[in-house]
Amino acid sequence: MSQFTSSYDPTSFEARLYAEWEAAGHFKPSGTGQPYTILLPPPNVTGTLHMGHAFQQTLMDALVRYHRMCGDDTLWQVGTDHAGIATEMVVSRNVMLEGRGETRDSLGRDGFINKVWEWKQQSGDTIERQMRRLGVSADWSRSTFTMDPQPSAAVTEAFVRWYEEGLIYRGQRLVNWDPVLKTAISDLEVENVAEEGMLWSIRYPLSDGVTYEHIEHDAAGNEILRETRDSLIVATTRPETLLGDTAVMVHPEDRRYTALIGKTVTLPLTGRQVEVISDTCVDPTFGSGVVKVTPAHDFNDFEVGVRHQLPMIKVLDDAACILSETYAQGWMTPLNNPKGDSRWINIIDIPESEFVIPAHLAGLDRYEARKQILADLDTQGLLVAAIPHTLQVPRGDRTGQVIEPYLTAQWFVRMDRLAARGLELVERGAVRFVPPNWINTYRHWMNNIRDWCISRQLWWGHRIPAWFDEYDGSFYVGRSEAEVRAKHALGPEVTLTQDSNVLETWFSSQLWPFSTLGWPDPTAMAERGFERYLPSSVLVTGFDIIFFWVARMIMATDHFTGNVPFHDVYITGLIRDAQGQKMSKSKGNVLDPLDIIDGITLDDLVAKRTTGLMQPKLAEKIAKATRKEFPDGIAPHGADALRFTIAALATHGRDIKFDLGRAEGYKNFCNKLWNATRFVLMNTADDTAHSPAQHQAGQDGQDAPRTPQPRTDAEQWILSRLAAVTAEAHAQFAAYRFDLLAQALYEFAWNEFCDWFVELAKPALNGNDTQAAASTRHTLLYVLETLLRLLHPLIPFITEELWRQVAPRLGIQATTLMLRPYPQPQQLETAAFANAAADVEWLKIMVSALRRIRSTLNVPPSRRISLLLQGGQEVDRHRITHFAIALHFLLKLEHIDWLSAATAAPPSAIAIVGSLKLLVPLEGLIDVDAERARLDKEIKRVESEIDKSNGKLSNAVFVQNAPTAVVEQERSRLTEWTTQLNGLRERRTTL
């Protein structure tokens, strides 16, 4: 047993305890009991963990510790994700910052991959160190990296099986293309940002001298315009893609243009003729009702191109510059495939001579090309108008660049059949969402699913298991080149080259529930408990990846194993800063969990927040804001204070505003628990209440302390409250209501145990009834030991440290709290305990009322007061007599006297408890006149402040124009002033 210090210092024991737990193997599955499994969403190996990780990992660890104490066979599967794009970007930047003149490209693929592996080792170690410091009780011996041999084999197996089943195909389609990274990216990595732009109207001349009578009507159907026109006006926000137009399009029921459907227009700047087509996707009210169709550079236009069999003309290269030579493609539909299904359509080259890009535009960046094209159109009299327009601009979340819809050969997964099955599993309850409203989000995404582009033009990641014949370009899919050659009888004369692309990160992540359990290797599956631990019990994750990860795990796990990946999906909110802003490096508001746990100096915090910025110009602004917010740096709070803060903030379905002040408050809670334990230990030093012991078997085979046989009302009350909070703890764990769990345990520990029972125990401990004193000592120890077990899943370090001091006093021989059984609600004698509980609740009301009077009158704590009683019921008289010793002790009373109803009371401060009137005579206690004058003056001052605040908040200009934070601050001030005024008036009324 370690030395018990007089003050709470988490740095003195947290790291030591974790090392002891891990060395003893306490984190490993026991192999007995009901399986309880949690999958850790693997953090990316791109740096360090942030508050979002700490938030989710704290909740997961609480669940794991709770179920471990409940006797379940717990497995927390942890690991890290290779995070293809993110990691490649970070390492590429670091290579350049090393100052050796090296770049990703100069290193070459193998050299760069070696650099990434070095980074992965460094980053992975940092992540594990952070998780350990937080208290994560995971089986580290099973930690998995998504590019370890076993998961990599699973990736290859899944790809090959899906390809052989026809679910994976390779084809030309539009993808999200980042022109800086020069790779396809997922929808998740695209942020649509509302930005101000322009809407240009361009004249497309009708071919062959065709004219038409243009007629427009108002909303009532009245003709408002009739004129002959020889061109169509097309509205666009992207004139630079005009060179790739292959049609213009109108709505089939738009009377203005029905006569022109099937005619052609001459494409400006190129002289190429394109057809006027009709499609119901056109909005007749947008612009002129005529839109350009550029299938190779717009997602909607691509689908139109498929439906209408339009050529695909690519005019931008992979860097978003105008191609020097045009690259045009067209459609050829195999006879045995459904027409119009773009997944089954082959693309053929179209002779380049049919499509010409003006030479002076070749090679221009897309925005330079836009300027030049607009200038050319204006010169030719074809630019009709340019008006401001708000549009949604797709930007890559890593580079900030505008993403291009880009036509390229990629690998895809057909999602319709998989999605139908994934939706069915959730609809019938095989997978449950908590909170349940998230099923609506899941349902919407699954009903609107598209084929999944899984290939990325990167070096870091799982190479696609496909080999190309260098002679004719045909490709073969297999688990290895040797398998491909054997299966297709390819001799050494055939030169094969593996696809240089890699699979997107989510492809391997979707296999996480079962690849970590050894799939597809039968031996590994048996060793890692595939049958025992799949499905897992719960997935704790954020709502932002319900589709991109959660849905794909459901679909893949069902397809490859015939099982669901997990029973419950607990969706958390996002962690934001105290002002509700998203935490990000560019905002400079990111908090490292370790800085809250162990503290950090101001200079180190500024350096951490300003180093490695994607936009270095923000460094000065971030440094200034950091120095203002944390003038003294961040003090150490310990892991437990951070964990309890997280639990208390974990409300269902809402984003979390993280306020460091809350962590300070819960550090005080830990300190309160520490001091209460010191009190109990000091007052039970010679306790022998555990002997003779009445044994009951504990989970770990050790004896449990005997159940108290209470001799006082206070003991019966605290035991009844302990039973209630124990039952509530189990209920809140089952409901994933960590906030309500933390609140219930906090209220019991701070208010009921520390503030009340410890105080109510003192009269018994110091009284002459030795049996009551012994019983009270045992109950103090028993309740404290049970409370430490209740709190352990949330705050494991301090509870373990304190428990090791308390347990021997109860005759407990076990060496660690984390393997002790979680408390179960006790069945108490209803009538006796209920009566005692009611009596103590009455006593608490009495004491609180009289303490408020003392506080209101500013009576020093050491000053004794008199108490007069008037009225009340017979039960009140009984309770006054019964609790006389406790009342004198707790309230420092000189005497208690009863007044008859007819007796006039002296000037007194008054409180009412039911029908009982409590009077504290003022004579000799305070200078009543002076106190009245002081309160009157203070009331006027506070009323003046309230008037000022009301004046500001009733001013519409202030409310509408001041920053939101300033307005909220003023509202908060008004609330504080109002509360203060009510208190002053109450005190004045007392006098």
Curated annotation (Swiss-Prot):
The keyword Ligase applies. It is an enzyme of class 6 (ligase). Residues 925-988 form a coiled coil. It catalyses: tRNA(Val) + L-valine + ATP = L-valyl-tRNA(Val) + AMP + diphosphate. It holds the Pfam family Val_tRNA-synt_C. Monomer. Belongs to the class-I aminoacyl-tRNA synthetase family. ValS type 1 subfamily. This is Valine--tRNA ligase. It comes from Xylella fastidiosa (strain M12). The gene is valS.
